[in-house]
């Protein structure tokens, strides 16, 4: 499932997508034998990702009821910064390391949400 949500009516000057923060919510499941390797690969990628100037938050959370199910939450200053992240060596390495780890019977989900910046400040 892929969902794109854009919120309008920002109080800080409009709802121009270029000026909005981008939140990604990704849900995925891995084969049981890949849980440790996924965590290790993600943590390496996270270390470099958090140093990117456009990254606001980057985390992965494991389900309490299913140890093979993970939730990834990312927040970026804008779409341009997210695009730059997609070209980084550390993300490409991570994606290469995990490419065969996914549970083929699980559909997963990907949501991209545009939000007004500094709403929580």
Explain the meaning of each model-derived region.
Residues 6-9:
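C-terminal motif of bacterial Sec signal peptides marking the signal peptidase cleavage site
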